[in-house]
């Protein structure tokens, strides 16, 4: 799966390998912003990229805002993402949309709109992302429908998809307790959980 997804980061990888300046915008909600932690996945991802590509200069812009939905993402896409003319954009929404009851069809349309607008810009590569499992089973089942919708959009629009949910569940199947990756009572990743997200992203680099 990761090998197949690497084609969506080909240009960015080439620039990193050449020691160029690379701008990445991590766009999303509190999972991207990093809720109640000092270091979220953009921090660990940038750290890993710097180790692998020491000659490159990576500007990692964290454009996550807690509580945001895809509708909020649409409204701030121009100034939060496109204004930076990024080489690569990650888009990560879904949990808040599911909790607020936004219909799946509208949710998918919002993602399609954001992808189209980014494509009309400076030629950024695009990775869509699911988020982590939730500890409460009914909410986890609900949000999984939204994660699957993100995957559908990625396939439809021919952009990358990073399956964070699957990566976490692999760790759980290997014996890591889900609760050890989540902030107590908050259903948000702790730093150990964020490291898994960064590791999954690095499989494309």
Which sequence ranges carry the predicted segments?
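Serine-esterase "nucleophile elbow" of acetyl-processing enzymes
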Residues: 1-66, 71, 76-85
């Amino acid at each position: 799966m990761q090998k197949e997804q690497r084609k969506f980061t080909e240009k960015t990888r080439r620039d990193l390998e050449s020691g160029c300046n690379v701008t990445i915008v991590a766009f999303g909600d509190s999972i991207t912003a990093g809720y109640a932690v000092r270091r979220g996945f953009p921090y660990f991802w940038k750290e890993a990229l710097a180790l692998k590509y020491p000659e490159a200069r990576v500007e990692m812009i964290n454009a996550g805002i807690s509580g945001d939905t895809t509708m909020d993402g649409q409204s701030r896409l121009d100034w939060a993402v496109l204004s930076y003319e990024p080489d690569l954009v990650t888009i990560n929404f879904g949990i808040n949309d599911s909790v607020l009851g936004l219909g799946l069809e509208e949710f998918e349309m919002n993602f399609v709109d954001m992808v189209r607008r980014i494509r009309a810009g400076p030629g950024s590569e695009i990775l869509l992302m699911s988020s982590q499992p939730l500890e409460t089973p009914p909410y986890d089942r609900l949000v999984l429908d939204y994660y699957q919708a993100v995957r559908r959009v990625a396939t439809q629009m021919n952009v990358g998809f990073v399956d964070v949910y699957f990566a976490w569940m692999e760790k759980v199947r290997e014996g890591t307790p889900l609760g050890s990756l989540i902030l107590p009572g908050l259903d948000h990743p702790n730093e150990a959980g964020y490291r898994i997200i960064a590791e999954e992203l690095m499989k494309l680099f």
